[in-house]
Swiss-Prot record:
CDD domains: AdoMet_MTases. The gene is trmB. Keywords: Methyltransferase, S-adenosyl-L-methionine, Transferase, tRNA processing. The active site is at 178. S-adenosyl-L-methionine binds at residues 103, 128, 155, 178. This is tRNA (guanine-N(7)-)-methyltransferase. PROSITE patterns: SAM_MT_TRMB. Coiled coil: none annotated.
Length: 319
């Protein structure tokens, strides 16, 4: 996820042991403590902050190491907001000039830390609103002695809009975002036309936007959104269509059983795939990328496989 021009593909990860001895002036970092839901700046947010309290080793890791690995951003209104005057200086932060990869919704840090370990010449910024996830990422950074990862607790659209200089990012990753199944919640989905425009602004020309989801409805949504963007080209346009399409396989297998637009437990309802759209039967559009080898298979992805769901990868190049 060989096309040209294209940034090089990274090739594709837990217990806190010794921390790397890299002295640096401490920075005050305060994790948010106020739950966020509803809107920000008049727009629905794509997340619900469930659990911001830290305990045990997470609390210890955050207290001891967040001043080194967490980017402290001045807030605007909400505790995950970014003041519009703040600009992230990656070269100053990492002490070098290197390709910058931004993972949005980095969770517990498995993917970003594994990628950083495999690609020491690349720098990584993990964007997350789940404070325990950030603390877990800090634990991994220290136990693996990584120096090329930073974490930031912030709302992703603001990070892309103002925090990151235009044209400064080599790749943006969004792996397994919240699908917001119910129709009335689709407006909360992270990937919308406005979001695609923000990604385009942050990326360098030729930079990559990688997406992965285990829900066909969201995959079709992303494909439709990106098809409407003049800023990107699908690197796998028309590929894996017809019987080879994972979407065709989902439609014909009925693996995603839904009732009222939300997933239900196995055996609780008859098979229905009408949520995927009117083109049920054979996907003649395709456009699905092969699995991105740079993405480690996390426990989250493993659960999707165990449930029988297929993974949809999409990869777009910034024009």
């Amino acid at each position: 996820m060989s096309e040209s021009p294209e940034t090089p593909e990274p090739s594709p990860a837990q217990s806190p042991e010794a921390a790397p001895e890299q002295p640096q002036a401490a920075r005050p970092v305060t994790p948010g403590s106020q739950a966020s839901f509803g809107t920000y700046g008049g727009r629905p947010v794509s997340f619900v902050r469930r659990g911001t309290r830290l305990q045990g080793r997470r609390q210890q890791a955050w207290e001891e190491h967040s001043d080194r690995w967490a980017v402290d951003v001045p807030r605007h209104i909400a505790n995950t907001s970014v003041h519009p005057d703040y600009v992230f200086d990656a070269e100053a932060e990492f002490g070098r000039s290197a390709p910058l990869i931004v993972e949005i919704g980095s969770g517990l840090g498995d993917a970003v830390c594994h990628a950083a370990e495999e690609n020491p010449d690349w720098d990584f910024l993990a964007v997350e609103v789940y404070t325990p996830g950030l603390a877990n990422t800090v634990i991994k950074i220290n136990s693996r002695k990584l120096s090329n990862v930073r974490v930031v607790e912030a709302n992703a659209p603001e990070v892309l809009a103002t925090m990151l200089p235009a044209g400064s990012v080599s790749e943006v990753w969004v792996f397994f975002p919240d699908p917001w199944h119910k129709s009335r919640h689709h407006k909360r989905r992270l990937i919308q036309p406005e979001f695609a425009a923000l990604v385009a602004a942050a990326l360098k020309p030729g930079g990559l936007f990688r997406v992965a989801t285990d829900w066909s409805n969201y995959a079709v949504h992303v494909r439709d959104v990106m098809a409407g963007s003049a800023d990107f080209v699908n690197l796998h346009d028309g590929e894996r269509r017809g019987p080879e399409s994972p979407l065709t396989q989902v439609w014909q297998s009925g693996v995603e059983s839904l009732v009222g637009g939300a997933p239900v437990k196995e055996g609780r309802a008859p098979v229905s795939t009408e949520h995927t759209g009117p083109n049920e039967g054979v996907d003649e559009t395709g456009g699905w990328a092969p699995r991105f080898e740079g993405r480690i298979r996390t426990s989250f992805e493993n659960k999707a496989h165990e449930a029988g769901r297929l993974i949809f990868d999409l990869c777009y190049r910034r024009l």
